[in-house]
Regions:
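Short acidic-hydrophobic surface loop/beta-edge motif
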Residues: 2-3, 94-102, 168-172
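Active-site-proximal beta-strand elements of phosphoester/diester hydrolases
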Residues: 6-16, 102-111, 125-129, 176-181
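Core catalytic region of metal-dependent phosphoesterases/phosphodiesterases
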Residues: 12-100
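Divalent metal-coordination and catalytic microenvironments
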Residues: 14, 36, 62, 67, ...
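Catalytic metal-binding/acid-base residues of hydrolase active sites
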Residues: 16, 37-38, 68-70, 97, ...
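Short, Asp-centered acidic motifs that coordinate Mg2+ and/or phosphate
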Residues: 30, 124-125, 155-156
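Conserved beta-sheet core of the metallophosphoesterase superfamily
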Residues: 61-63, 84-86, 133-184
Length: 184
């Protein structure tokens, strides 16, 4: 758990459809899922089940950042999924920033090109599915994400995707980079 501005934040990723087997600690004001909640969201019921489970978690803010297994966000059906989540009180962050009662959370995709003037200077948490290049990435990280972290200097960068480095942290300048994958 992370505490910022008296808000308690819990984050995870990579449940791959096993979310009901996963224990979320009590007491979080903000719960973040950094993607790969399902194995294949195009199959139907698995995604709906995740939305039901995630929306029922006892936190004021629920943030979802799609991963590479949330294929519908890449094939043009993301608006429908995002609407379903919004109706259940879940905020989908993709290349966006959300102020969660004084905790500023942002997300970028691994191939975003963001102009320097558009980089937020007050970002508390950056959430991505992919890791930054060279940081707990098993040689699969994103150079764009690394550059964004170096320029924006968030307090935390939370990501998943790489199961082999699940739970590990790395200090990158002022930023604590943490792999929040729950699958090893």
């Amino acid at each position: 758990m992370i505490i910022i501005n008296s808000s308690t934040i819990f984050a995870f990723s990579d449940t791959h459809g096993h979310h009901r087997d996963f224990k979320v600690p009590e007491g979080a004001d903000i719960i973040i899922c950094a993607g790969d909640a399902v194995e294949d969201d195009l199959k139907g019921g698995e995604y709906d089940d995740f939305i039901e489970w995630f929306s029922a978690l006892p936190a004021k803010w629920k943030i979802f950042v799609p991963g590479n297994h949330e294929l519908s966000f890449e094939v043009g059906k993301g608006d429908e999924k995002e609407k379903m989540m919004a109706e259940k009180g879940i905020t989908v962050l993709q290349d966006a920033v959300e102020d969660c009662d004084g905790v500023v959370i942002g997300s970028i995709s691994g191939n975003s090109i963001i102009a320097d003037e558009d980089i937020p200077k007050d970002l508390d948490i950056l959430v991505t599915h992919m890791p930054p290049y060279g940081i707990l990435d098993e040689e699969m990280g994103s150079l764009e994400i690394l550059n964004f972290v170096l320029k924006s200097k968030p307090k935390y960068h939370l990501f998943g995707h790489i199961h082999a480095t699940a739970g590990q942290e790395f200090q990158l300048g002022q930023t604590i980079c943490r792999n929040i994958s729950v699958t090893k």
